[in-house]
Regions:
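ABC ATP-binding cassette signature C-motif
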Residues: 1-140
């Protein structure tokens, strides 16, 4: 049993959420693949009793089951999770506050989901969807 956010959880059940089942749960860390190590690090980080968790593109190269476990872990995380991600759907499911860099490095703080932030941004700035740039040949 492990302590997870103040409640006792079966350790094998916990790591199985990160796609470690059966004999995978008995592997030594040194023989894990890169993807398995990433899943292990996520599982360990989410179970720590930390105040702040920094995640840089946490949804890159993870499977759907691990993504769901990550979302659940972040929802139950008692501290502050700072997440840098381009995955808008993931952000919409987990974010409660947004710190965004807009335009010429203007920093905007917003309380709410990512969808609510996007709607607010559209109201404030209009349609600022990036446009394809056409380059003009300067030399002959």
């Amino acid at each position: 049993m492990i302590n997870l956010g103040g409640r006792e959880v079966n350790a094998r059940a916990y790591v199985s959420k990160f796609n470690f089942s059966g004999t995978d749960q008995e592997k030594k860390c040194g023989v894990l693949s890169g993807g398995e190590r990433n899943r292990l690090h996520l599982a360990l980080a989410l179970k720590e009793d930390a105040n702040v968790l920094l995640l840089d593109e946490p949804t890159n190269d993870i499977d759907v089951n691990t993504l769901r476990a990550l979302e659940e872990g972040l929802e139950n995380f008692a501290g502050c999770a700072v997440v840098v991600s381009h995955d808008r759907w993931f952000l919409d499911r987990i974010a409660t506050h947004i710190l965004a860099f807009e335009g010429d490095s203007k920093v905007v703080y917003f309380e709410g989901s990512y969808s609510e932030y996007e709607e607010s941004k559209r109201k404030r700035l209009g349609d600022v969807t990036p446009k394809r740039i056409r380059y003009k040949k300067l030399i002959g």
